[in-house]
């Protein structure tokens, strides 16, 4: 309707065919090729609620139903509604929808019984178009039946109708979304006799390529048939294969489809392969039909070489996915050590069987003997690993020092206890030994006894230090040091090590030196005679696995590089200190061969495990530097009652306790000494001094060469020599001049400078200076003698200098006895 007096306005449309009328479209134009124009964004913004659009993602065509409100300006498109309306009336407010096939507009209320825009479907086809499609479908089915009966005329009519159907039918978007690739039946396309008759460009190119492949095959490989030329045969075969390919993978679209193209590339590649002549011959001789060829997979069409390679790759992948079952016993590492998991008996049976087969095959030759020795050692190690476990429990084997995983050097230093425990375990392990010893012989006990020789010899020597050996990049190693001796006769391994290095600090490794440079240097220093050498052996101090592994890693680090470690912990008396690794078969260095009275001689050892030796180059040792305090009675007592064998850990604890006891005894001795006072005396004629402990007045200053102020390892004050007295005669410890009241040592005598000495060794004071006793109680001489006989006191570190009296214990004891008699 038009409003009087107003200029008619243009109708707005959101259809894809905006600006064109359907009656002007040519009948020969294929709607499938018409692409949708982009909507005007301005128009969409002005009327956003008049259209419900849903953009398809897969369909090639963009035709879809449109629903809009009638407007006054709508003048394009055909209106055909069941209500009889032929024009759009915007004033009634009804929504109109367009058929996607005939492009005619109808009221939504009339055909769908709803005026709600949300309920309008995305794709709409009117009733007339639906009936038309139903009739065409029935006609197609009838044509298929007629084709099966072999009626040529009906087949021709059917093909004509199919061509007409293809040129007019456009699938709606709903169908395109559900089935993006439409399959084509054999009856919907006319078969051609020549390649030139094919109208689709893609199909024509595919058929021509297949023909070229078959033409290149020599005619001697196949038989074209009677009255048929090779070229005609190849063309017919190519057309047949292409038709099967199109029927299986083609679509109704002119673009044919991606599946068709991909399959054709696979066929062309495998048929052109120069190594795949077998496939070409099979196709041309009819062994492989065109339908079978199209259905074959890519791997089935490969040449034999590629098929074999693919089979090998598949088999390799299968092998990688299968877990390999290990027949050897597994080891579980726990906080208690390593435990064998699995059936031990079954494993022993397998080893026995392998051993018998090995003997039968190799005989008694040298190679056979070596092979048997290897197997015997493996079984012996496993047997030893289970010996201790079976003695404790028959169900869960425990760790043993002879485990095949743990190297032979990883064993406790507590050899005395370990040997007895091992013998006890060996008795309980007789069942396993009876089974294995029949073949192997009883060799495990001899091997174990040989292994304990070296460690027993070293561990029984007196140790001089325990601590850690840290090095950058490696774990700290807990070790104990056993003295190997020195090149000086004045070196006492019990006390002299305190002047070589600091026992309270670790033996830090600060560098390394090449062995080829270190050995000549050490030989030169020792040959010059200006310095002495002292050495001790380092062994792991704990039985834990971590300490043993750290010890072995430290050894392996230097031995594998043929280098010596440079030790940082050394006193000012030491010029150089090195850590030397010694393999079981290495001869001791020349430097170590010059040691005097070593506690352990390396040349006599049958070493079966690596060792670490610390070597110190010290200044020339004098009697005062290297001598040690010793009491003959204690030595005799030690020889008469030798100490029991102890483990390293027990010996460390015992010596720590002895050192504390010595300190406490010295403190008690100081407390028990009575205080005395110094009384000046007048000069008098020389007289024999009766009491040996009488206090005296101020003493003259003693020159440095005459003696020293020192103590007997914890005594209150030192012993001073009487000025002018002959060497070897002790004097009375005195207090400094002007300091009365300082307690004197409970031993010795003092007098003025004497000009003569009695034969008995008693100093004679001048006549003008008689002695007067002060009345102080005499000291406890028995306690002093007991203190001097204490072995811990004797083994304590020496003072910087020593009195001659301390080097003559017999004289010291005789003086004490004389004092007691008086």
Curated annotation (Swiss-Prot):
It is found in: Nucleus. Residues 22-48, 148-166, 359-383, 637-653 have a biased composition (Basic and acidic residues). Gene3D superfamilies: Transcription elongation factor S-II, central domain (1.10.472.30), Zinc/RING finger domain, C3HC4 (zinc finger) (3.30.40.10). A zinc finger (PHD-type) spans 78-132. Residues 392-404 have a biased composition (Polar residues). One of its GO terms (molecular function) is zinc ion binding. InterPro entries: SPOC_C, TFIIS_cen_dom, TFIIS_cen_dom_sf, Zinc_finger_PHD-type_CS, Znf_FYVE_PHD, Znf_RING/FYVE/PHD. Residues 655-664, 673-682 have a biased composition (Low complexity). GO terms for cellular component: nucleus. GO terms for biological process: DNA-templated transcription; regulation of transcription by RNA polymerase II. It comes from the Eukaryota. Residues 11-21, 49-71 have a biased composition (Basic residues). CDD domains: SPOC_TFIIS. Its main location: nucleus. PANTHER family: TRANSCRIPTION FACTOR BYE1, TRANSCRIPTION FACTOR S-II ZINC FINGER DOMAIN-CONTAINING PROTEIN. Belongs to the BYE1 family. Negative regulator of transcription elongation. This is Transcription factor BYE1.
């Amino acid at each position: 309707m038009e409003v009087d007096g107003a200029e008619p306005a243009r109708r707005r449309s959101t259809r894809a065919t905006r600006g064109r009328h359907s009656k002007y479209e040519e009948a020969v134009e294929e709607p499938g090729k018409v692409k949708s124009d982009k909507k005007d964004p301005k128009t969409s913004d002005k009327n956003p609620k008049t259209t419900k659009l849903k953009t398809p993602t897969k369909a090639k065509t963009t035709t879809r139903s449109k629903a809009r409100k009638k407007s006054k300006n709508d003048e394009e498109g055909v209106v055909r509604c069941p209500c009889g309306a032929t024009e759009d009336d915007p004033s009634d407010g009804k929504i109109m929808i367009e058929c996607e096939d005939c492009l005619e507009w109808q009221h939504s209320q009339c055909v769908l019984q709803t005026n709600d825009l949300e309920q309008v479907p995305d794709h709409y086809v009117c009733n007339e178009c639906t009936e038309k499609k139903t009739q065409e479908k029935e006609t197609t089915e009838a044509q298929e039946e007629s084709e099966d009966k072999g009626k040529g005329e009906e087949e021709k009519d059917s093909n004509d109708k199919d061509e007409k159907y293809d040129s007019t039918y456009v699938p709606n978007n709903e169908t395109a979304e559900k089935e993006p690739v439409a399959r084509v039946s054999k009856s919907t396309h006319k078969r051609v006799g020549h390649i030139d008759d094919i109208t689709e460009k893609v199909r024509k190119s595919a058929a021509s390529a297949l023909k070229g492949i078959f033409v290149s095959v020599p005619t001697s490989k196949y038989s074209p048939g009677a009255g048929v030329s090779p070229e005609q045969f190849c063309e017919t075969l190519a057309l047949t294969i292409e038709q099967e390919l199109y029927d299986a993978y083609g679509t109704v679209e002119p673009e044919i489809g991606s599946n068709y193209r991909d399959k054709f590339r696979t066929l062309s590649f495998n048929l052109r392969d120069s190594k795949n002549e077998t496939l070409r011959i099979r196709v041309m001789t009819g062994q492989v039909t065109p339908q079978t060829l199209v259905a074959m997979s890519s791997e089935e069409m490969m040449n034999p070489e590629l098929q074999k390679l693919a089979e090998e790759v598949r088999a390799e992948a299968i092998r990688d996915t299968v877990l390999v079952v290990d027949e050897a016993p597994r080891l579980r590492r726990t906080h208690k050590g390593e435990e064998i998991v699995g059936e031990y008996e079954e494993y022993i049976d397998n080893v026995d069987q392998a051993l018998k087969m090995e003997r039968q095959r190799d005989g008694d030759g040298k190679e056979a003997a070596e092979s048997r020795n290897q197997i015997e050692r493996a079984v012996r190690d496993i047997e030893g690993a289970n010996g201790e476990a079976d003695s404790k429990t028959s169900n869960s084997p425990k760790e043993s020092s002879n485990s095949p995983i743990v190297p032979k050097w990883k064993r406790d230093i507590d050899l005395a206890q370990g040997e007895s425990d091992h013998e006890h375990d060996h008795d309980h392990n007789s069942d396993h030994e009876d089974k294995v010893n029949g073949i192997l012989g009883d060799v495990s006990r001899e091997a174990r006894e040989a292994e304990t020789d070296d460690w027993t010899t070293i561990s029984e020597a007196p140790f001089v230090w325990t601590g850690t050996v840290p090095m950058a990049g490696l774990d700290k190693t807990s070790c104990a040091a056993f003295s190997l001796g020195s090149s000086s006769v004045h070196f006492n391994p019990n006390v002299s090590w305190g002047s070589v290095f600091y026992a309270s600090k670790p033996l830090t490794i600060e560098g390394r030196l090449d062995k080829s440079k270190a050995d000549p240097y050490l030989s030169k220093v020792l040959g010059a005679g200006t310095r002495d050498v002292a050495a001790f052996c380092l062994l792991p101090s704990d039985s834990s696995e971590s300490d043993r592994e750290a010890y072995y890693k430290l050894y392996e680090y230097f031995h594998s590089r043929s280098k010596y470690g440079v030790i940082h912990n050394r006193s000012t008396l030491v010029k150089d200190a090195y850590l030397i690794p010694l393999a079981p078969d290495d001869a001791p260095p020349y430097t170590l061969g010059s040691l005097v009275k070593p506690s352990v001689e390396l040349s006599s050892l049958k070493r079966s495990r690596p060792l670490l030796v610390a070597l110190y180059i010290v200044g020339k040792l004098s009697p005062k530097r290297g001598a040690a305090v010793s009491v003959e009675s204690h030595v005799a007592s030690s020889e008469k009652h030798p100490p029991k064998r102890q483990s390293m850990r027990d010996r460390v604890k015992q010596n720590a306790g002895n050192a504390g006891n010595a300190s406490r005894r010295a403190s008690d001795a100081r407390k028990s000494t009575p205080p005395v006072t110094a009384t000046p005396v007048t000069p008098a004629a020389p007289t024999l001094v009766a009491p040996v402990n009488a206090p005296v007045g101020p003493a003259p200053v003693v020159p440095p060469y005459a003696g020293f102020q020192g103590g007997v390892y914890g005594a209150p004050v030192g012993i001073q020599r009487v000025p002018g007295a002959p060497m070897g005669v002790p004097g009375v410890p005195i207090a400094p001049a002007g300091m009365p009241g300082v307690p004197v040592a409970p031993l010795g005598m003092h007098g003025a400078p004497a000009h003569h000495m009695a034969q008995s060794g008693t100093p004679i004071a001048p006549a003008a200076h008689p002695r007067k006793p002060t009345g102080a109680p005499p000291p406890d001489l028995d306690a002093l003698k007991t203190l001097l006989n204490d072995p811990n006191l004797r083994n304590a570190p020496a003072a910087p200098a020593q009195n001659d009296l301390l080097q003559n214990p017999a004289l010291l004891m005789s003086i004490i006895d004389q004092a007691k008699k008086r």
